Amino acid sequence: MVTACTSRLIDGLPDEVAIQCLARVPLFYYPSLHLVSRSWRAALRSPDLVKTRTRIASTENLLCVLAFDPENTWQLYDPLRDHWITLPIMPSQIRHLARFGVASVSGKLFVIGGGSDRVDPLTGDHDGIFASDEVWSYDPLSREWACRAHMLMPRAMFACCSLDGKIIVAGGFTNCRKSTSKAEIYDPETDRWDPLPDLRQAHSSACTGLVISGKMHVLHKGLSTVQILQGGGKNWLVEDYGWLAGPMAMVRKELYVLSNGCILKQRRGNVPDKMVSCASEFQSRIGFGMIGLGDEIYLVGGVIGPGPTNQCIKQLSDVDILNVMSERPTWRPGSPMSRCRGSILGCALLTI
């Protein structure tokens, strides 16, 4: 027999049930709920709320974006409400952070490594920090940034992925601008970095990371070879997939690329890539972010350089969306970024 009780959260409901009610509320409304009472604010900041949202299948996928302007300011995009939320400024001492890695695990956004892209307006000199080992996490429940355990080494322009609740980084460049084959893995539960086997190959080009079929793939700019983490992190395998070069995005476990003014579905082996949609209208747009969310590909921000019709660089806050699962995929505009504009320095999905 269940006895009536008075809850400190919602009168007449056990706290366990009240937490489930709060977990079903979209994150968009949390700032208003924080104002209800101290007990609600404490409940909304609890790490248990993320676990409850996951357990009752009430998680949301939000798009996280950092653009060149304004400095070190992230925004979150809610696709269901077509709405942008501005986060508190990231408290890093590195000005105009760039060349970093970004990933999402445990309901938090992690910003890893990178260096300064600041240029002295008087002398034209670049800041001396090319790569760093610092790590920051953002908790959307407490709406606060926190400094986490530093990487084992400074790095920039490296591959970074979240996989099985952990973060893996590999390759990139040191602060001396020397390429590295070192790799490491981060556990958010213990706030600790541990080494992984070195990449089989180090290249003097930037690299990115993708998770495909449950494995991390490291791709180097300008090269067709891919390095794949095998055996639960025991070694790396080198494959030549012959993939087209260009911005890539994962949608429903399929890899898409923007190449030669077209969106194509990338395939391995001798299977030809599948044409999905024309994207020729974006050929004059550079420095944009491209990422998959749900059934769609998002193109965010970027710049349009000088040309016959304009004499200066135009920074964009535009968002363009393509549903690759529809019978006839067509581009549609999304709500533009409300604060950020220009080249996209970081782009990731946050599941909360």
Name the predicted role of every residue range.
Residues 1-352:
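Kelch-like beta-propeller repeat domains
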